[in-house]
């Protein structure tokens, strides 16, 4: 019966987070999503010495359960994959909570008239990301994992995403060093502009009107920032957050992942544009969070 799955006297899945559910069956046992991330980390994120850094953002009420499972399983996977895991945890910050809405999309209030707050979405974890001591960070949903028979594709594409990121970041850093030196020609600035437009997909219509000094300010602003490369999959059902060219407040056009909540669904043209999207991002990102000076 379904109650045997979610009730306390059964598997208690109704009270457990997705990361702790029994997820994939193997000949030698069953793995949770958390364990699958241990395996993935060993396959594509191990350093030269075999060290694998994995960070989980979890809810306060479930943290002890995650820590207990890691303590029970980490030795097993270290022995199996020749890895040395460094597992850390953080919790979504209450300061990122957002106002809950009712069925009419109006702020929800409790019986005392106080606004009810709820945890924000994935974007609220950006502070947790920024707190990490790392150069490159792979970001995934806890349950966005596949069984071993499908992991080869996962590993290949993770390496591809990271390779694209490192290649773009290396070039951006070289250009920033050039701009810092003060020794550059207008032709070199045009080369940097082409990189920003063609590789980073960021455009500005009035660039030809800018003097070189203003061009440098603009280029430095676009290059000296965190960088991310996002994996996309084809839409086969309801469209999710996908890649769009967005108009920014500073007059530039850049590639962004837009969710349905960011689209004016009352505008037929914009709604149709969103619904015709061919790809979406299943929270599969690789991010570079240090600047060109290592900060």
Question: What kind of feature is each model-predicted range?
Answer:
Residues 2-6:
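Short, small-residue-biased leader/transition segments that mark boundaries at the very start
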Residues 58-65, 89-102:
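Short, conserved secondary-structure transition motifs
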Residues 30-33, 42-46, 62, 107-179:
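Extended, domain-scale alpha-helical bundle/helix-rich regions
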Residues 140-141, 149-238, 244, 250:
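Long, K/E/R/D-enriched contiguous segments that form extended
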Residues 65-67, 97-99, 127-128, 137-140, ...:
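Short helix/loop capping segments that flank catalytic or ligand/cofactor-binding pockets
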Residues 30-52, 71-77:
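Histidine-anchored nucleotide/phosphate-binding helix
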Residues 207-217, 225-294:
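Beta-strand-dominated extracellular/periplasmic modules and repeats
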Residues 51-56, 84-88, 114, 134-138, ...:
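Beta-sheet entry/capping signal
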